[in-house]
């Protein structure tokens, strides 16, 4: 499914294609990966105007930058994963299953770990199952539950996709490793305040390990 931005008539603004991505609560519309090549930074320009009209613009500029960064990264990651027949959401599910002890997890737990709505989990697993990367089987610990289990083909695809993402540093090649750790820590505070998790002995508190 491809939607188009309004416009595109002769003399009007050019249309821009959008790529779908499986995300919680539905499908985000993600702009295709194409440099805008603007002669100025639109977020910085908006911040200047904001300062004149409303006051401190730092929160607005930070949020707007995060939202734009998400668009850029999702487009970049999906472009890297497209040759493997995956979106980033489906890749996350495959990796989660690979991380599990037996390569299988209850659907409910997949939703919790990926922090997505149950409907999104169903859609993701449906796609992976149709590709032969995941199978479903009854959960022996819960007569009404279902397990999603990664297949041998799913493990192979996940391994190849991971190699490509690692080579591209997940689209974050413009940052040093220490800067990535700092970014994780800063955004972790936002997630903590939103109630994503309860800090404790099992939760990392210093950010991801960094190879030097």
Tell me the role of every PLM-derived stretch:
Residues 58, 62-77, 153, 164, ...:
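C-terminal ligand-sensing/allosteric alpha-helical core of TetR-family HTH transcriptional regulators
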Residues 107, 125-126:
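Short, hydrophobic-biased segments on the C-terminal half of alpha helices
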Residues 181-212:
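Exposed, interaction-prone assembly regions rather than primary DNA-binding/catalytic cores
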Residues 1-7, 11-84:
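N-terminal leader segment of winged-helix/HTH proteins
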Residues 73, 114, 157-173, 190-197:
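Alpha-helical linker/hinge and terminal dimerization helices associated
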Residues 57, 67, 71, 75-117:
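N-terminal helix-turn-helix DNA-binding core of bacterial DNA-binding proteins
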């Amino acid at each position: 499914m491809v939607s188009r931005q309004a416009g595109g008539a002769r003399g009007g603004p050019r249309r821009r294609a959008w790529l779908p991505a499986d995300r919680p609560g539905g499908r985000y519309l993600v702009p295709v990966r194409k440099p805008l090549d603007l002669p100025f930074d639109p977020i910085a320009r908006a911040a200047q105007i904001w300062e004149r009209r409303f006051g401190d613009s730092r929160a607005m500029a930070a949020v707007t930058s995060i939202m734009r960064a998400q668009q850029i990264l999702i487009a970049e990651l999906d472009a890297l994963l497209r040759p493997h027949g995956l979106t980033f959401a489906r890749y996350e599910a495959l990796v989660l299953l690979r991380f599990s002890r037996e390569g299988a997890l209850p659907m409910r737990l997949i939703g919790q770990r990926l922090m997505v709505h149950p409907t999104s989990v169903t859609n993701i697993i449906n796609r992976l199952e149709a590709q032969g990367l995941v199978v479903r089987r009854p959960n022996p610990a819960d007569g009404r539950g279902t397990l999603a289990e990664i297949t041998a083909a799913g493990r192979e695809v996940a391994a190849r996709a991971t190699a490509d993402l690692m080579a591209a540093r997940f689209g974050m090649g413009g940052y040093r490793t220490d800067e990535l750790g700092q970014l994780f820590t800063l955004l972790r505070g936002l997630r903590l305040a939103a109630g994503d998790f309860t800090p404790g002995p099992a939760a990392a508190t210093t950010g991801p390990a960094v190879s030097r």
